[in-house]
Amino acid sequence: MTENFWKRGILRLLPILCLSMAFNAIAQNPCASKEAMVISGNTRFTVLTPEMIRIEYSDKGIFEDRATFAIQNRQMDVVPAFSTGEDNDYLYITTDKLNLKYRKGTNPQTQPASDQNLTITMNHNGTPVIWYPGKTDNQNLKGTCRTLDGCNGDNKRAEMEDGLISRSGWAVIDDSWKVSRADGSHSFALEPNSVVGYDWWSERKDPQALDLYFMGYGHDYKKAIGDFTKIAGKIPLPPAYVFGYWYSRYYSYSADDYREIMREIDKNDIPADVMILDMDWHWNGKASSASENIGGWTGWSWNTNLIPEPTKLLKEIHDNGYKIALNLHPADGIDSIESPSYYNAMSKELNGKYDSNGKIAWYLDYPDFTKSFFKNIIRDHESEGVDFWWLDWQQHLTSPYTSGLGQTFWCNHVFYNDMVKNRKDRRPVIFHRWGGLGSHRYQIGFSGDALINFPTLAFEPYFTSTASNVGYAFWGHDLGGHAFTDEKIVNNPELMLRWIQFGVFTPIFRSHATDDSRIERRIWKFPNFSKLRDAVKLRYALFPYIYTMARETYDTGIGMCRPLYYEYPENEEAYKYEGEYFFGNDILVAPITEPASEDGISRKEIWFPEGNWWSVSTGELINGPCVKTLDFSQDQIPYFFKEGAMIPMNLPTVRNVTAPATSLIINAVAGKEGVGSLYEDSGDNTDYANVYATTAFTHGVKGKTETYTIAPREGDSSGLVERRSWALNVLNAAKPKSVKINGKSLKSSEWKYDADNKTLTINIPETDCSVMTEVKVKY
């Protein structure tokens, strides 16, 4: 049974041609190493990792070696060690983690589901677990869903798709074409297309074939997610500016309105980086937008009644330090009345191929339409100053022209890859809805039209962190909520504040609301504006940490918002307290999502994992593990630094996240050794995979002396500041007996100790970033 299976003549020859992802910025090869494959009749097994095996079955004996919507890469760096064997009836494959048993000559998936033809056995926390195709799992930890449109409280929980991890210890990716995704679409193959210059959908070789990926990672959740991104593609690093504040509102703003908004933002000292122009930028048929009954949800031409000189306005927005995105609802195609010049250009170029009754239908399924559309319309607006696009797809979920082609996923794929190919001067990014597994490759998510109330806010922390279970790491929400059913709460200052405070600790920081004059989203109009602004400034202060964690997401596949059970999988509390999450490696967040008591105080029950946690808002050290109920005023946010952490932050005066960081802060929690880091690049470069720099921080403890080290910057520092000053804030500190920088003792007047807040502040003079700095504090 242990004889190597290759020698038994069962392995078939691979097809000579093994297609690769020719146009992806990151090299991918969807064809696995032949050494990883075991073929038995009409069944093929591919051992991808010790915990992951691909299982294919085709009545025709046809296997798929192209990429699919979900899977991009099967050529792993190393073929994992495994052994094979057989007897008269069964094939056996054994890895370090899995034992597979297959009845030769059968379809692995029986009807109804049973363990008759295929089982995989694994050890999960000391207990054997047996899986077979079709086995149900009620302990899956879920992933995400297409949209929060209509979200009221947690009514969208039931729509959340299965994730890639489970308390059961196993999960399955069913990438079979015949199995519908949540939106009714299917996972097509992808292959290079010479017309558009990137990968295009293609029918599967055998649409009825079985194509499963068994993932038996136990409770090593982070490894499961990380290995998923190895086969499904990395999560691209968004440009730095997307982590700033976005001003966004669905409203009939004129050019002068946008100018006034920018003046008010500047006058009120509000940091901001992105300006969204929602659908009133184009003719949309609304009387309120002076559209003269021209257009509708779909539009491509500027509403010159509102914005008479678009290029001039976009230049002014850029000159004020903003990036610009336009909202698109493209489903209705190109109309000869709404966009006559675009219609005529495309009709001529395509020889009227897609014309019907004065309209070119939305044929994004086809390369010739797509090439003409981007050439004639999208390039034109980008030349005017549009930086990226918001794909607000709300129409039919699957294509009326190609059966099973998901419109959400396909729009995302095409817009993103067009930007990769045709806008090489900037980092590709689009703002879009979840379209199923593989959507993480198009990185920034727009969750949609959630209702304005506290229960909906309470659902979003769970929803955001849980999306990391499918690699969807960059959800952005309508902070403040989108629409309302209760007018009494529509502009509730406390609700708006708590939503914005939650948004500080989410990937994308964007307030938004629907076109209703009763809803206010200009934070300077709220009576608690100073608290709202403080939250925005906290977001900007955290940017160096946030961007560092975004890079970690690219490197590891782990989202910056992550469930507690990633770190504490065997603690029941990590599953129970689903409104808490980790924001990166070192910050625990428990947002306030309920209204305060009559005394204005919010009381929050919080689980603290093992270790000590510094409460930034209240200035106290909390010893975990424990459950505590803490009080928070409305200007306080429950977030906690891990003891030993070293967290890089901006000065509170920063107004743009891309401003040169000539001075930074390190917040370090005294008492325990730890590490931290700072990631830097030029912010919008496409070669960030290799062109970047990092600075390591270490925190050592020896007796009553604590040593904080800023290592020399490593990597490519082209375009980055060469010299920098630092402020080291040591939290939970006693008053020191002595402080030294690089061996030189400081006078007591050269450092500051705040006894009330237990904070020691040491200012480190401007230093070359290539030089190490060491601070020793003796207590």
Language-model features and meaning:
Residues 1-30:
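Bacterial Sec-dependent N-terminal signal peptides
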Residues 45, 53-55, 93-100, 588-591, ...:
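Short, well-ordered beta-strand segments enriched in hydrophobic/aromatic residues
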Residues 153-154, 238-241, 248-287, 295, ...:
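A conserved hydrophobic secondary-structure block that centers on an alpha-helix together
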Residues 81-84, 742-770:
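Extracellular/luminal ectodomains and secreted, surface-exposed scaffolds of diverse proteins
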Residues 84-239, 249, 255, 262-267, ...:
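Catalytic and substrate-binding clefts that recognize carbohydrates or anionic sugar/phosphate headgroups
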Residues 417, 438-445, 459-460, 467-477, ...:
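Catalytic core of carbohydrate-active enzymes
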Residues 114, 123, 131-133, 271-532, ...:
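Aromatic- and carboxylate-enriched substrate-binding clefts and catalytic-loop regions
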Residues 49-88:
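A low-complexity, Ser/Thr/Gly/Pro-enriched, surface-exposed linker/loop concept
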